[in-house]
A protein has these predicted regions:
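Feature of Fe-S/electron-transfer and energy-metabolism proteins
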Residues: 1-105
Length: 105
């Protein structure tokens, strides 16, 4: 009996006609969750990310929502989210595949 695969990452990349440009991503529902996030309070976004179980991919698997809760929003300084796609581990190409095949995801 085959196990059905449910992709969360690279979800559409094998579909005919899918490309890595932004228009194609939007056509497949991309950025809908971002629109939702713009209507939410920062603490609610952090809580949703925490409840989702999303973890860092740096080896320690630290909960992303917990890390986001550590940000000092009262400082008045800008807050930036940075994507680190450096692959320092020999033989791993996960970040490269995501950035090349579905960069907007």
């Amino acid at each position: 009996m085959a196990i059905e695969e449910k992709r969360l990452i690279l979800k559409y990349t094998d579909q005919p006609g899918y490309t890595n440009d932004i228009d194609c991503y939007i056509k497949h529902g991309g950025y809908e969750d971002l629109k939702k996030a713009f209507k939410m309070k920062p603490e609610d976004i952090c809580e949703e990310v925490l409840q989702s179980g999303v973890r860092g991919r740096g080896g320690a698997g630290f909960p992303a929502g917990m890390k986001w809760k550590f940000l000092d929003r009262k400082s008045g300084k800008p807050i930036y989210l940075i994507c680190n796609a450096d692959e320092s581990e020999p033989g791993t190409f996960k970040d490269r595949q995501i950035i090349h095949k579905d960069p907007h995801q």
